[in-house]
Amino acid sequence: MTHPLIPQIIDLATPIAEKLGLEIVEVVFQTNKRPPVLRLDIRNLSSDTGLDDCEQMSRSLEATLDATELIPGSYVLEISSPGISRQLTSDREFIAFKGFEVIVKTYTPYENQKEWRGNLQGRDEQAVYLNKKGRAIAIPRQLVAKVQLNDQRTT
């Protein structure tokens, strides 16, 4: 279940990220740790996400969070890149990574295979859509076990 502060944190972080040429990919607030950990995954919209991107986002967001006192008490702020082998789960991620190379694994074979590679075109209630060398593929959503970014780049 999503922490109730997440929407407010996203509202604060998004304009900061946009000003830096970044995008918020995921926000997690781990309140079961002491002190609690607020983790944001970011990506650079124009180049590979680097340490400088994480540092700039961290400094800017920390100042804003401290000024608003949204999070009471002490907490740890972690800013990182989601990484190339990231598993996609949310609608937001499927939109953000449209056009990226992905690997789709299915629970049971679909058209005689359990692993598909191609460029992500999107997903809806019925299917995950790929483009594999110009061929459109729609994999039924109920068969999809996971979708992750392809770090092998062999499509």
From Swiss-Prot:
Subcellular location: Cytoplasm
Superkingdom to which the source organism belongs: Bacteria
Keywords associated with the record: Cytoplasm, Ribosome biogenesis
InterPro entries: Ribosome_maturation_RimP, RimP_C, RimP_C_sf, RimP_N, RimP_N_sf
GO CC, alphabetical: cytosol
GO biological process: ribosomal small subunit assembly; translation
Function: Required for maturation of 30S ribosomal subunits.
Similarity remark: Belongs to the RimP family.
Protein name: Ribosome maturation factor RimP
Species whose genome carries this gene: Gloeothece citriformis (strain PCC 7424)
Gene: rimP
